[in-house]
Each structure stands twice: as C-alpha cells, then as structure tokens.
Amino acid sequence: MDQVVLVPDPERLVHLQFRRFAGCPVCNLHLRSFAQRYDEIEAAGLREVAVFHSSNAALRPYTADLPFAVVGDPEKRLYAEFAVESAPRALLDPRAWLGIVRSVLHTMWGMVREGRPAPPTDPEGGRLGLPADFLIASDGRVLACYYGEHADDQWSVDDLLRLAQSARETVAEPQSTA
C-alpha cells in the first residue's frame, strides 16, 4: 500500500478499479472475489490496482491481506483525472440493494468469524462514490472502461479476463497497410 504503483505498467495490462471508502462492504466483497482468483488474473498478464477515496492508514485494516496494489486517494485526484463520480444513486438505485444486503451480511460474518473490523460509521470521502473500471495498455491507452451506475455495478473477474483476452487479440491482429 505504501509502495510505488506504476500505471501504466510497461510489462502488463493494468486493471485500474475505483472503489468507494475503506471498509465499504460492497467494495470489500468485490475485492475478495478478485483476491480469490488472483492467480488467474496474474496468469492472464494483468496487474490489479484498486483505488479508494480513503487514506492508506484508513485502508490498512481492511485491505492489508489483499494480494494486489491498493492505493489511497483521499483528495480524489485520480477520481477527478478519470472522471469517476459520486452520486446518491450509488445507494438509492434499487439494482444495488441486493448487493448491499449480501455484502453487509458477508461483512457481519467476517466480523464475527474472522475478527475483521466493522465498516466506519462516518467514512472518509463519504458513502456515495460510484465504481469504475479501466483496462490500461502498457503504452497508457485505455483499452476498455466502465463507469458503474450504482455501488454494486462493476466488472467481475470473468468480465476482466474476457476484456483482457479481447484486447490482446485486437492488438495481435495485423494492421492493414492500405
């Protein structure tokens, strides 16, 4: 978390994902799915980077065991650079509600069974952040992006692997010299 993270990475595609706040139940459940399949992500030649609008100190208790880079951006500079928004629809969109309930139950289970910390009651940066995903080439081009419409609207690992494969196939196709 306190290391330098290169984006773009000269040797790999980068999946740059923007999450909400440290301890966000929806974000943490989502990131756990990426951690569980991290070997597949690495084998696909991807570097995983998750950005939160919280400080590194606030993130540590929730993300220290993740096998990929987590970046704190409490000033939301990267959010502004990539046009990632905050809006009430993050929580008010009915499509988010099932994911919110599922992630809160998962968080409570982790608190009881694994001693994980509770989410903050007043999170740094607020609760209304929207997720976003970017697939970035080694030359810095954005190959694919997705701006979530609510808190639980983001790429899955399967989406990411499919997009990375498609990007590689597109790059590998011979260019016409007409």
Q: Where are the predicted features?
A:
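A short loop-to-beta-strand scaffold at the N-terminal edge of the catalytic core in hydrolase folds
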Residues: 1-5
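Short active-site neighborhood of thiol/selenol oxidoreductases, capturing the structured segment around
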Residues: 6-36, 48
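Residue-level preference for short coil/turn positions at secondary-structure junctions
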Residues: 9-11, 44, 129
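Short beta-strand/turn micro-motifs composed of small residues
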Residues: 19, 52, 137
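Structural microenvironment flanking redox-active thiols in thiol-disulfide oxidoreductases
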Residues: 30-81
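Thiol/selenol-based redox catalytic cores and closely related redox-interacting motifs
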Residues: 69-152
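A short, polar/charged loop-to-alpha-helix boundary motif
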Residues: 151-166
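Cysteine/selenocysteine-centered motifs that mediate thiol-based redox chemistry or coordinate metal-sulfur cofactors
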Residues: 170-178
